[in-house]
């Protein structure tokens, strides 16, 4: 084999290696940054009210990609920051994503980072995340909800996709976290509506269902006098529509007096359970509460 042939083969392998280090959008990825998309209603937003113990210290390996500007915290949309709550928008609070991420980094190898992208809208039906028909629902939304929708350029689904694509430049999407259903209580078509949304996300982000599970959390449980607890039966049917869906139990997670939202202690436990569900799916042992 002459020198010219050897040089050509080295160049060819260099191109192959470069391709392996780029994601589908042509950007270098950190395969040790695990990214999780979060969406839903006010419980996934994080209900206002953050207790002192939840403000820190937060491991620097757990970060949030700001989906909107946070002027009061100096966060700029589209950039990564240490995941000190609130994670969704400036007016939101502690939610399940907080202790999901904290529990993950406590149980994953020290070289693994965790990133959250949270686009959620209080009070919304799942129809707001319908890629093709969201405008029909959004046009009937009350003004306070419209104001939230407008922080996402009027299209929360598309905004989530855009933020997720930014996150894909820096990491690999490993899962989708959903907490929604209060506004769809007793809607038997909810699993199919979630399926359509999930499939659209998978397609639009060039993902594979077998590599990106969907974790759906129950609503405030009946044993906490949850106002929408009847919806948990329908939520439990989601794996029949989406084989890669997993249900996170809310039993024992403390609720607030409104019977719709979780208390801070409830969010801590619930977020830990999301993480305990995700860890085996990532190939790691089940988490102990830390």
Regions found by a protein language model. Name each.
Residues 1-31:
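Bacterial Sec-dependent N-terminal signal peptides
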Residues 29-290:
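Cell-envelope and extracellular/periplasmic
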């Amino acid at each position: 084999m002459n020198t010219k042939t050897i040089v050509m083969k080295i160049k060819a392998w260099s191109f192959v290696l470069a391709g392996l280090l780029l994601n589908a959008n042509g950007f270098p990825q950190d395969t040790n940054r695990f990214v999780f998309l979060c969406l839903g209603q006010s419980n996934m937003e994080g209900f206002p009210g953050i207790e002192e113990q939840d403000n820190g210290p937060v491991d620097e390996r757990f970060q949030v990609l700001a989906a909107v500007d946070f002027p009061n915290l100096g966060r700029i949309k589209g950039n990564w920051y240490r995941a000190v709550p609130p994670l969704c928008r400036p007016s939101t609070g502690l939610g399940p994503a907080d202790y999901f991420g904290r529990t993950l980094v406590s149980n994953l190898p020290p070289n693994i980072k965790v990133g959250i992208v949270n686009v959620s809208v209080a009070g919304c039906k799942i129809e707001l995340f319908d890629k093709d028909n969201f405008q029909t629902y959004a046009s009937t939304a009350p003004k306070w909800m419209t104001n939230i929708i407008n922080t996402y350029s009027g299209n929360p689904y598309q905004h989530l996709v855009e933020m997720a694509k930014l996150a894909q430049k820096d990491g690999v999407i490993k899962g989708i976290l959903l907490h929604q259903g209060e506004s769809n209580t007793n809607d038997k078509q909810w699993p199919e509506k979630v399926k359509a949304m999930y499939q659209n996300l998978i397609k639009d982000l060039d993902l594979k269902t077998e590599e990106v599970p969907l974790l759906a959390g129950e609503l405030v449980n009946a044993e906490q006098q949850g106002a929408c607890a009847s919806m948990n039966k329908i939520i439990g049917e989601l794996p029949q529509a989406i084989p890669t869906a997993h249900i996170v139990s809310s039993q024992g997670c403390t609720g607030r007096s409104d019977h719709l939202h979780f208390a801070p202690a409830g969010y801590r436990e619930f977020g830990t359970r999301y993480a305990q569900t995700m860890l085996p799916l990532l190939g790691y042992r089940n988490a102990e509460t830390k």
